[in-house]
């Protein structure tokens, strides 16, 4: 089912400090830095390692899922997203196997890819995100 690692999402307390760390230690500058508003305001730097995206995000409030995760677990990996070829099929399979979803329907991320988010309480506490990204062409095997 998994074709590749689509992205690794890190939760951090200070994005500016982490951007500086990436540049100093890895020689990497972010491809973009974005600020999102709404129910889950955050500041995010995006890097790439091959086709894998690295998302480094600082929550800008204390009530978002990311902020609550950061408060409980500290900085680190929030989730790893795996690239797949059929989001709807993957969601149906996960539900048939007893998993709950964070959203009833497959959702579309701001960057245009389809996401399936398995509720960690039904996956042994681990957050799984499955991504069907139309910009990355893969065979369906």
What spans do the regions from the language model cover?
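A short, acidic/glycine-rich surface segment
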Residues: 31-33, 63-68
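Amphipathic alpha-helical segments
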Residues: 14-30, 92-97
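Short, conserved turn/kink motifs that form compact alpha/beta structural patches or helix kinks used as
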Residues: 59-61
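Vicinal oxygen chelate
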Residues: 1, 5-13, 45-50, 55, 67-89, 91-141, ...
